[in-house]
A protein has these predicted regions:
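Hot-dog-fold acyl-thioester-processing enzymes
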Residues: 1-51, 109-136
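Small beta-barrel nucleic-acid-binding modules, principally OB-folds
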Residues: 47-68
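HotDog/MaoC-like acyl-thioester-processing domains
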Residues: 65-66, 76-136
Length: 136
């Protein structure tokens, strides 16, 4: 069983990610990052990318801006025959400080929880290949 399996992804949000004035990044971008987390979990558990079926809940808790460094985590909390329930979090760890100078940034200690969600992904039984795809 893979309950408790956690994966992590870190990245910097770029100016291209900004969707609103003031370099604000839309919350949907966080959901896109969660999609990558879920895909990695599916490959690790079943050797297949599977399909993200949907969210049971999503909470947008803090804004994200271009230049922020974020860390996304996903943990499998329940394993069904073909479905897996995942707890997802997106944390802001570094934030630019252009008010100080053009290249200043702050390490956020503690990090700021930006988005929290729970969702389910499904891997068809006939697509199960074992952990990491090593079954076939």
């Amino acid at each position: 069983m893979s309950e408790g399996l956690t994966v992590e992804l870190r990245m910097r949000l770029s100016a291209a990610d900004a969707h609103y004035g003031g370099n604000l990044v839309d919350g949907a971008h966080g959901l896109e990052i969660f999609g990558d987390i879920v895909t990695e979990l599916a490959v690790r558990t079943d050797g297949d990318e599977g399909l993200f079926a949907g969210y049971a809940k999503v909470e947008f808790l803090a804004p994200m801006y271009a230049g922020d460094f974020v860390r996304a985590t996903g943990t499998i909390v329940k394993m069904g025959n073909t479905s897996r329930t995942v707890a997802l979090e997106l944390w802001k760890e570094i934030s630019p400080r252009t008010d100080v100078n053009d290249s200043a940034a702050d390490l956020l200690d503690p990090p700021v929880l930006v988005t929290r969600a729970e969702g389910t992904y499904v891997v068809k039984r006939e697509h199960h290949r074992g952990p990491g795809g090593q079954g076939e």
